[in-house]
Amino acid sequence: MLTDLRLYQLISPSLPVGAFTYSQGLEWAIEKGWVKDEQSLALWLTSQMQGSLATLEIPILIQLHHLLGVQNYEKAQYWCDFIVASRETKELRIEERQRGAAFAKLLPQLGIDLSERTFPLVNQTQVAAFALAAEKWEIPLVKLCSAYMWSWLENAVMAGVKLIPLGQTAGQKLLIDLTKFVPEVIEKSMRWPCDRIGSFTPAQVIASCQHETQYTRLFRS
């Protein structure tokens, strides 16, 4: 039970890591009319779940969870470098590092000490932070992956609710609809070969590029 409570804390919107300040290109996509209602937002997020979460973030989270457990920091560093390199725009790379840096400050205050080997990993990407926290708090891997996806989905949907805008009830309905795909995505991630880890979300990359010079912005990405 305690591990579940620690997991809820790790994905809480109140966690002071600034997750709510990023839209990952969604803000520009909405301004240009690519995303304009509940249905188009669902399609936008589903494509990211299948083209990035299932084939990049979750597979690397799985790798890091194992590697940190066996203290293979050299290989863990490889995957941390890989995920940052896979962020195809400047603002997405900055976001990855900013989230990681926020966790690097937070985790020691939550009782997870960072060594000279683990600090550079967490400071680079929040994926390493999730993996390390799960290893220290003995959170099962499948629960960790589900929680990571929930955290991403909730932030993305709430950004859409604010920007389109949608009603709060519509946002909650969308979360129910999209979480139905989570088990499928995790199963796909568990089987995904290491030599195929990567993402293919060209629309998001274009939107993120354009967002970097968008005149009026609420979000940092």
UniProtKB/Swiss-Prot annotation:
Superkingdom of the source species: Bacteria
Compartment(s) where it occurs, according to its Swiss-Prot or TrEMBL record: Cytoplasm
The keyword Cytoplasm belongs to this UniProt entry's keyword annotation: yes
MF annotations from Gene Ontology: nickel cation binding
Keywords: Chaperone, Cytoplasm, Nickel insertion
GO CC annotations on file: cytoplasm
HAMAP family membership: UreF
Family: Belongs to the UreF family.
Function: Required for maturation of urease via the functional incorporation of the urease nickel metallocenter.
Oligomer and partners: UreD, UreF and UreG form a complex that acts as a GTP-hydrolysis-dependent molecular chaperone, activating the urease apoprotein by helping to assemble the nickel containing metallocenter of UreC. The UreE protein probably delivers the nickel.
Protein name: Urease accessory protein UreF
Protein's organism: Vibrio parahaemolyticus
